[in-house]
C-alpha cells in the first residue's frame, strides 16, 4: 500500500538568498590613541594590584601631618639651635677664663655629637641604598619590556660589580660570551637572570633553607615558649641581615626597620593563604599529624613562616624581578623541612620532651 500524497503548501513570502554579513565601518586611530593601547600581561597586572594594596596600607599606616606636628618639629629645631649656640658660648667663655677642665668636657661632648651626626649620615646612606635597590628593580622591569639595544648590558655589568662577582667567574664569562650585537635589552637581562643571578640566588636559598630548618627543629624540641620566641626573633633578624649582605646591601637601623616593615606587609597580604595551603596539603595527603608529634607540626609551621620571610626579603633585596618561574616556591622548603624532621626526631613511639 502506498501512502497518500501530502497537499501542497504555498508560502506567502518568497525565499530570500543568503544574507551578507554586516561590516562595521573602519576605525582609524591616530598616534595619541595608539599610545593608549598596550598588550595584556597578567603578571604585570598582579604586580600592579599588589603595589596598589601596599600603597593603600602604607598610606593608612603613615601618620597624618597636622599643625601640631609641625609646631613640635619647629620647637625641637629651635631648641637644638639654642643648645648649639649655648654650647659655643660656653666654649668661648671657658677659653677666655682658661678653664681647661671645662674645655676637656666640651671636647668630649663635641666628639660625641660628631659621632652621632656621622651615625645618622651613615644610616641615611644605608637607607638610600635600599631605596636605590628598589629603583634598580624598576629599571630592570622596564628593560624587560624594552626592545632597544645598548642599555641592558651596561645595567647588568653594574649589577655584577655591585654584587662583588669576580671578573673571571665562569657564569659571568659565559654570559658575556653568549651576548651578540643582535640581542636587545630584554634578551640581555633575561640571559643575565638565567646565568649570572643564580650565583647569588643559590647562596640565599641555602641560607633560607638552613634558617628555616633550625627554626623548625628548635620549636620541635624546645619545652619553653619564651625561648622559642627569642630564638625565632634572633634567627629571623640574622636571616634578613644575611640576605641583604649577600645581595650587596648593608642594612642600618632605619633601613632594617623599613625592610622588616615591607616584608611583614607582604606576608600579611600574600603569605597567609600560601602557608595554609602548603600545610593543609601535607596534613591531607601525607598525614603528617599521624607521623610526627604536635610539636613537630608546630615546628613545620614556624619553619614555613621563616622561609616565607626569607623569600620576601630575597624579593626586596634582589636587583632583578622574578622572571618565568624563578621565584622560589614554599613547597620546596616544605619538603626539605619534613625530610629533616623525619630524620632527626625520634620515632612515633618515643615522646618528645614537652
From Swiss-Prot:
Location relative to the cell: Cell inner membrane
GO cellular component: plasma membrane
Keyword Cell membrane: yes
Its membrane topology: Multi-pass membrane protein
InterPro entries associated with the record: DUF697, UPF0283
Short name of one Pfam family: DUF697
Origin: domain of life: Bacteria
Transmembrane segments: 71-91, 101-121, 214-234
Keywords on record: Cell inner membrane, Cell membrane, Membrane, Transmembrane, Transmembrane helix
Main location (coarse class): membrane
NCBIfam families, alphabetized: hyp_HI0043
Protein family according to the UniProt entry: Belongs to the UPF0283 family.
Family matches, as HAMAP family: UPF0283
Protein name: UPF0283 membrane protein plu2581
Source organism of the structure: Photorhabdus laumondii subsp. laumondii (strain DSM 15139 / CIP 105565 / TT01)
Amino acid at each position: 500500500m502506498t501512502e497518500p500524497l501530502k497537499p501542497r503548501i504555498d508560502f506567502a513570502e518568497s525565499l530570500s538568498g543568503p544574507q551578507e554579513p554586516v561590516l562595521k565601518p573602519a576605525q582609524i586611530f591616530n598616534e595619541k590613541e595608539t599610545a593608549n593601547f598596550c598588550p595584556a600581561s597578567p603578571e604585570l597586572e598582579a604586580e600592579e594590584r599588589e603595589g596598589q594594596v601596599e600603597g593603600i596600607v602604607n598610606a593608612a599606616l603613615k601618620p597624618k601631618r597636622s599643625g601640631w606636628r609641625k609646631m613640635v618639629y619647629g620647637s625641637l629645631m629651635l631648641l637644638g639651635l639654642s643648645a648649639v649656640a649655648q654650647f659655643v658660648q660656653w666654649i668661648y667663655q671657658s677659653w677666655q677664663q682658661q678653664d681647661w677642665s671645662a674645655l676637656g668636657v666640651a671636647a668630649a661632648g663635641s666628639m660625641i655629637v660628631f659621632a652621632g651626626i656621622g651615625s645618622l649620615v651613615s644610616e641615611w646612606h644605608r637607607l638610600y641604598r635600599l631605596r636605590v635597590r628598589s629603583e634598580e628593580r624598576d629599571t630592570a622591569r622596564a628593560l624587560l619590556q624594552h626592545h632597544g639595544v645598548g642599555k641592558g648590558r651596561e645595567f647588568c655589568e653594574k649589577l655584577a660589580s655591585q654584587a662583588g662577582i669576580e671578573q673571571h667567574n665562569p657564569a659571568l664569562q659565559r654570559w658575556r660570551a653568549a651576548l651578540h650585537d643582535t640581542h636587545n635589552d630584554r634578551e640581555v637581562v633575561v640571559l643575565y637572570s638565567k646565568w649570572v643571578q643564580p650565583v647569588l640566588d643559590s647562596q640565599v636559598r641555602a641560607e633560607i633553607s638552613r634558617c628555616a630548618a633550625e627554626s623548625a627543629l628548635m620549636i620541635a624540641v624546645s619545652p619553653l615558649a619564651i625561648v622559642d620566641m627569642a630564638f625565632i626573633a634572633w634567627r629571623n633578624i640574622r636571616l634578613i641581615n644575611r640576605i641583604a649582605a649577600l645581595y650587596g646591601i648593608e642594612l642600618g637601623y632605619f633601613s632594617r626597620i623599613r625592610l622588616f616593615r615591607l616584608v611583614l606587609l607582604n606576608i600579611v597580604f600574600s603569605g597567609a593563604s600560601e602557608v595554609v595551603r602548603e600545610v593543609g596539603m601535607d596534613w591531607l595527603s601525607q598525614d603528617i599529624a599521624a607521623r610526627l608529634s604536635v610539636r613537630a607540626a608546630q615546628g613545620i609551621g614556624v619553619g614555613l613562616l621563616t622561609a616565607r620571610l626569607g623569600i620576601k626579603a630575597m624579593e626586596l633585596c634582589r636587583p632583578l624581578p622574578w622572571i618565568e618561574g624563578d621565584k622560589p616556591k614554599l613547597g620546596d622548603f616544605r619538603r626539605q623541612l619534613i625530610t629533616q624532621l623525619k630524620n632527626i626526631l625520634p620515632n612515633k613511639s618515643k615522646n618528645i620532651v614537652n
